[in-house]
Amino acid sequence: MSELGSIRESIIHLCNKFPNKYWRELEKTKGYPDEFVKVLSAEGFLSVLIPENFGGAGLGLEAAGIILEEISRSGGHPGAFHAQMYTMGTILKHGSEQQKQNYLPAISEGKLRLQEFGVTEPA
């Protein structure tokens, strides 16, 4: 099986542990999927786009897309995971070396969640 096929099978297996009832309850209570996020972090799915030298998997957008696709297919809402996976790209592209060292390993380990960021532009 290819690496991407293995990723797909792994995320399907993980998503099957969180039935529709889990997602419906979160929607009803307007809750955040903390338990699901913890498992995704522990399994390394939220750090697929972070380079290996910062503790991530160093995979590409196709792997990230597969993960989000299978979360959606299983009945989950990928919004919270999309933010975690993609907004750290701002640190990779525009962050100082110190910021990369401070934040990316912690994101990779699931100790830090980066859900949003602000942008300012000169007037």
What are these regions (language model features)?
Residues 1-17, 53:
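Flavin-dependent oxidoreductase catalytic core characteristic
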Residues 20-123:
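Glycine-rich flavin
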